[in-house]
């Protein structure tokens, strides 16, 4: 191979690398307030049937929505009312709260990825007239980024990878150990809880810059 050809190849590699580095690594950030995903069984026990629930708002993730009804969480130390119910229903009930919520309720839920319910905390879930004792299912959700496979290619990450994200706000902070979740059905968005949002002085429209 001639020296000129080698030079052209090296220049192309450098150009490709620089272009990759120049790709904006920003993602929209959303604060995920305390909420619950109910199983069909628990919807029936609390409300009679799923027909009693109406969708009032579509969420940023395709196919996800909020119902019109709310529940109260009751723990050994206190209770938290007006907790949103998100749909669609799941195979198992899952409750996502913050560390501040956990202290107010008097429980010690683990930090988990959504869907990992083994050895999670219990809680009483109540409506105006009915209540169920959930033996497990309460967690503090790990901060994470939803993205499509195409997004993952652009950001040079893969499903299950952990990254750092600098929250671009009036009170910028760097969040480590942010889980990347990749699926065709997802929409690009980073989810943090209220504790993390308050620490960063979050406001709607806040973005995060991914740090590899």
Swiss-Prot record:
Phosphate binds at residue 90. The keyword Zinc applies. GO terms for molecular function: acyltransferase activity, transferring groups other than amino-acyl groups; metal ion binding. There are 2 Zn(2+) ions per monomer; Zn(2+) and CoA bind inbetween the 2 domains in each monomer. It is found in: Bacterial microcompartment. The keyword Nucleus does not apply. Zn(2+) 1 binds at residues 35, 37, 96. Zn(2+) 2 binds at residues 144, 146, 191. Its cofactor is Zn(2+). It catalyses: propanoyl-CoA + phosphate = propanoyl phosphate + CoA. GO terms for cellular component: bacterial microcompartment. Pfam families: PTAC. CoA binds at residues 31-33, 77, 198. It comes from the Bacteria. It is an enzyme of class 2 (transferase). Pathway: Polyol metabolism; 1,2-propanediol degradation. Keywords: Acyltransferase, Bacterial microcompartment, Metal-binding, Transferase, Zinc. Its EC number is 2.3.1.222. One of its GO terms (biological process) is propanediol catabolic process. Involved in 1,2-propanediol (1,2-PD) utilization within the bacterial microcompartment (BMC) dedicated to 1,2-PD degradation by catalyzing the conversion of propanoyl-CoA to propanoyl-phosphate. Formed by 2 beta-barrels, each is capped on both ends by short alpha-helices. Belongs to the PduL family. This is Phosphate propanoyltransferase.
């Amino acid at each position: 191979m001639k020296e000129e050809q080698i030079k052209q190849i090296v220049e192309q590699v450098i150009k490709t690398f620089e272009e990759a580095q120049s790709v904006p690594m920003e993602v929209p950030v959303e604060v995920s307030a305390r909420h619950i995903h109910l199983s069909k069984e628990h919807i029936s026990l609390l409300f009679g049937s799923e027909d009693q629930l109406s969708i009032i708002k579509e969420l940023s993730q395709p196919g996800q929505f909020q119902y019109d009804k709310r529940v109260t969480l009751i723990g050994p130390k206190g209770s938290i009312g007006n907790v949103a119910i998100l749909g669609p229903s799941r195979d198992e009930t899952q409750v996502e709260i913050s560390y501040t919520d956990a202290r107010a309720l008097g429980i010690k839920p683990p930090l988990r990825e959504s869907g990992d319910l083994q050895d999670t905390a219990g809680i009483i879930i109540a409506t105006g007239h009915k209540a169920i004792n959930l033996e497990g299912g309460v967690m503090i959700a790990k901060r994470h980024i939803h993205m499509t496979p195409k997004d993952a290619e652009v950001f040079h990450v893969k499903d299950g990878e952990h990254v750092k994200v600098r929250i671009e706000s009036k009170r910028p902070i760097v969040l480590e150990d942010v889980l990347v979740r990749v699926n065709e059905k997802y929409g690009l968005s980073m989810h943090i809880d209220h504790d993390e949002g308050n620490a960063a002085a979050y406001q709607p429209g806040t973005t995060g810059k991914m740090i590899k």
